[in-house]
Amino acid sequence: MSGRIFLAVIFLTFVAATASAKTRVAEFKGSGNTTTAIFRVESPWVIDWRLDGDYEHMMGLEITLIEAKTGKHVGRVLYTKRRGNGVKLFHTAGLYQLRVSSTLARWTVKIDQLTREEAELYTAKGSN
C-alpha cells in the first residue's frame, strides 16, 4: 500500500511540475553586438531582457527579431538607452534569431516558452 502512495506522490509531483512551469528555450549574454544562435519556439513565448552598464547616459540596447530560415527582419523588439528590464510576449511560433546591438552595456536575454495560461497573466502597462 505504501508503495502505491509513494508512486502516486511521485506521479503528481511530476505532472504538477511539467504542467505549470515555463520552459527556458535559450539564454544569451553579452556586452557587444551579436546575432544569436537559432532557437525554435511555439506560441506563446516571451523575451525576458535585462540591461546594465557603468555609464548611465551613454548606454544603449537594440534587439531585433530575425526569421532564421530567410534572414527576414521581423521587427524591432526593444530599443532603450536606460538600465532596466522587461518582457515582451509573442504569439507566433517559428525558428528565430536575435540581432543584438549594444553600446557600453551588459545585457542578458532569456527566451521562455509559456503555456497559454501563463501567457494570460502578461498584461501591458496601463491596460487595466
Can you describe what each PLM-predicted range is?
Residues 1-2:
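N-terminal secretory signal peptides that target proteins for export/translocation
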Residues 5-14:
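Sec-dependent N-terminal signal peptides
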